C-alpha cells in the first residue's frame, strides 16, 4: 500500500466499482433484469426504472427465470443495453450469463442494490457459492476453511477463497472439526 493510500480508502483494482443507475442515451433497447420486484427497490431506482424508455423487464422471481434470461439475451438485437439490479452475487451471475450470450461489458450496467450476498470461488475444489460478506467461511464443497481475498474475478463473477491454513488444509476436515 502506498503512502497516498490509507486503510480506510484503499480498494484493490480487482474489486468491482458500481455505477449509478442512468439510462444509456445511445441504447436502442433497454433490457432490465431485477432480482426483486420494482416496488421493493429504493425510490431512486424505482424512478430509474420508470424513466427507461420502453424497457423489457425480467424479474428473477418469475417462473423459469434462467430460461427466460437466456432467451432474452440471445435474442437481444444490436443496440441493446442490459441493466442488472440486485445483490452482488445476483448481478455477477447475470453478468457471466450475458457475456456468455455475446454481450460486451460496455453493454452491461450492474447496479448493486441488494443484501450483502456475494459469490466466493474455492480455489481448492472449484465450487462457487453464494455467501454473506464475511472474511472467512467453510467451503460447502470441500469443507476447507477459506479466507476470502479482496481479489475479484470478473470472468467467474466471484471473490477468491483460499485455504486459511495451507500447511494443514484438510486437518480440520479429517478430524471433523469444521462446522457446516
Name what the model sees in each region.
Residues 96-180:
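Cys/His-clustered metal-coordination modules, chiefly Zn-binding fingers
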Residues 1-118:
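FNR/FR-type flavoprotein reductase catalytic core
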Amino acid at each position: 500500500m502506498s503512502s497516498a493510500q490509507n486503510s480506510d480508502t484503499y480498494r484493490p483494482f480487482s474489486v468491482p466499482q458500481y455505477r449509478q443507475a442512468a439510462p444509456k442515451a445511445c441504447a436502442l433497447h433497454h433490457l432490465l433484469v431485477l432480482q426483486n420486484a420494482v416496488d421493493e427497490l429504493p425510490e431512486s431506482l424505482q424512478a430509474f426504472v420508470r424513466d427507461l424508455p420502453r424497457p423489457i423487464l425480467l424479474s428473477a422471481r418469475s417462473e423459469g427465470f434462467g430460461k427466460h434470461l437466456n432467451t432474452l439475451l440471445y435474442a437481444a438485437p444490436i443496440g441493446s443495453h442490459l441493466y442488472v439490479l440486485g445483490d452482488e452475487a445476483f448481478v455477477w451471475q447475470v453478468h457471466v450469463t450475458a457475456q456468455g450470450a455475446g454481450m460486451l461489458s460496455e453493454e452491461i450496467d450492474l447496479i448493486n442494490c441488494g443484501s450483502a450476498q456475494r459469490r466466493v470461488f474455492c480455489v481448492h475444489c472449484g465450487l462457487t457459492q453464494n455467501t454473506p460478506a464475511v472474511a472467512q467461511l467453510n467451503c460447502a464443497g470441500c469443507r476447507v476453511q477459506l479466507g476470502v481475498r479482496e481479489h475479484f474475478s470478473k470472468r467467474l463473477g466471484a471473490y477468491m477463497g483460499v485455504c486459511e491454513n495451507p500447511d494443514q488444509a484438510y486437518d480440520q476436515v479429517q478430524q471433523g472439526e469444521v462446522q457446516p
